[in-house]
């Protein structure tokens, strides 16, 4: 559980992102998917549509970067707008922040805390599937974004990395997947410190 003074208890700060995402979902229903990408990300090489299609399975409600027992990394989240539960999830997520339900969540009040709270609830009670491209896919390390398949195309300047303008070499963990095994050898990643 985060300490009392932690940013993770700032519901107002994180409600902005939740309201942005829920508004986008409501206004994008002519599309199949909505992808949230934090503004502090950098795409360093072209990403083929086939890559995104593989990340966003038709049967999954959301695709996210899980971190095991910690809240997910929500710098990238794919929302399946054709899933029969997407509107319910969206309405319930927004409602947490409008009607103070967020304050009942004991792990934190961030967008990440509330999203994982709801997806676990939907998995348990509604039988939905989610696509965890982080720890559930055997990605190692705390900075799951760059250690996942997303690191083949993007960097996420989370936290103090904004100052340096890149992630750090120490963020990389040895990978066991064929697809990401040599990720740190891509030209972009070879230049970081």
Q: What do these predicted regions represent?
A:
Residues 37-38:
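Active-site acidic Asp-centered loop
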Residues 34:
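Short aromatic/hydrophobic "clamp" motif used to bind/position activated sugar donors
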Residues 75-83:
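Short glycine- and hydrophobic/aromatic-rich loop-to-beta-strand nucleating segment
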Residues 1-29:
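Active-site-proximal specificity loops/subdomain of glycosyltransferases
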Residues 4-10, 65-66, 102-103:
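A short glycine/serine-rich beta->alpha loop
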Residues 41-74:
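Conserved donor-nucleotide/metal-binding helix-loop-beta segment in metal-dependent transferases, i.e.
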Residues 82-193:
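Catalytic core and acceptor-binding pocket of nucleotide-sugar-dependent glycosyltransferases
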Residues 21, 77, 115-119:
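A residue-level signal for conserved active-site and pocket-lining positions in enzyme catalytic cores
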């Amino acid at each position: 559980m985060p300490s009392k003074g932690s940013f993770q208890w700032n519901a107002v700060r994180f409600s902005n992102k939740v309201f942005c995402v829920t508004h986008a979902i409501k206004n994008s229903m002519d599309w199949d998917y909505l992808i949230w990408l934090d503004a502090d990300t950098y795409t360093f090489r072209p990403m083929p549509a086939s890559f995104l299609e593989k990340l966003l399975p038709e049967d999954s409600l959301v695709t996210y970067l899980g971190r095991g027992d910690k809240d997910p990394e929500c710098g990238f989240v794919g929302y399946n707008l054709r899933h029969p539960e997407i509107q319910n999830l969206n309405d319930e997520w927004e409602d947490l922040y409008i009607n103070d339900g967020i304050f009942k969540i004991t792990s934190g009040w961030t967008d990440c805390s509330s999203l994982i709270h709801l997806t676990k609830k939907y998995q348990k009670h509604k039988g939905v599937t989610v696509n965890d491209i982080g720890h559930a896919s055997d990605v190692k390390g705390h900075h799951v974004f760059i250690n996942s398949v997303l690191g083949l195309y993007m960097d996420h300047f989370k936290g103090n990395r904004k100052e340096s303008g890149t992630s750090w070499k120490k963020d990389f963990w040895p990978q066991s997947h064929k697809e990401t095994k040599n990720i740190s050898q891509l030209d972009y990643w070879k230049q970081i410190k």
